[in-house]
Amino acid sequence: MTDLLSLYRTMVRIRAFEDAAEIASQGGVAAWGKQASDKPALVRGPLHLSTGQEAVAAGVCAHLKPADLLTSTHRGHGHTLAKGADATKMMCELFGRATGYNGGKGGSMHIADFSVGMLGANGVVAAGLPIAVGAAQGLKIRGQDAIAVCFFGDGAINRGPFMEALNWAVVYHLPVLFVCEDNRISATTASAPMTAGPGASARAASMGIAAVQVDGTDVQAVSQAAGELIREIRTGSGPRLLHALTDRHKGHVSVDPGTYRDPKDVQAALARDGIARTRAQLVAQGHTAQVEQIEREAQT
């Protein structure tokens, strides 16, 4: 099991980045109508925050090596940070600066850092799936000791690339982990009414892919499940799928007030916050000083 303090450090680092990015993009109004700043917006364009979903990125990426490859989604800041990307270069990219990862021309949804195996976020739903499968096939052809990981949302399972990617991965027995971050909301609409039949786990199982469903707000549960699946992939067992049930705390984009959501559902999601849960565990274990140090470091 990966050290809980290390997992907490990654989660807090992601949350601090998302909080700063949110304020920079708001023009004074934070999600849910709360005042964030009286300064004008410094980040333009859509900004999809992963606030609330940190445990999935932290738990999975804790088991990845530098040579492992990763593809992400439009909500990809957490994955990118957890894979080892530089937070300053990421923020510069959001600000449109030449010192950003893409020279300030890609923005939030297209950040990539090949030096740490981050092949890129993607503004098209489900588009990262075939990219990850192609990367995995490349690793296998070259005989490299590495795997590919693909993060995608629950809305992606209703798009063609999802089934195509799973099929290809099974046919060619590829070293790829599919990670479904299921926050049960596709943009501004509940996913369930738009989904016929079973979800990601059952669809993967129908193709012979072993799948595990886990509480995506519990970073220890995510880490344990992801670690086992990744070990199986590394030993030649073929593709695997992790279905993480998680919560999106914010609107679809940073300026979205989320009024289409039931306030009770939002409060329930906030009450399940993985960071708060992990903090409480660590404090109970006597790690208050380390927790506070991690939190101070995340703000710098």
Whereabouts are the PLM-identified features?
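Short, cationic motifs built from Arg/Lys/His that form the positively charged side of catalytic pockets
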Residues: 15-18, 75, 228, 248
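Short acidic, gly/pro-rich beta-turn/loop elements at beta-sheet edges
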Residues: 21, 80-82, 188, 252
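Intrinsically disordered or highly flexible coil/loop and linker segments, enriched in small
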Residues: 17-21, 100, 104, 235-239, ...
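Conserved acidic/glycine
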Residues: 1-56, 254, 258-300
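Cofactor-binding active-site loop characterized by glycine-rich and histidine/acidic residues
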Residues: 30-172, 193-196, 201-208
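Glycine-rich ThDP/TPP pyrophosphate-binding loop and its adjacent helix/strand module
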Residues: 118-300
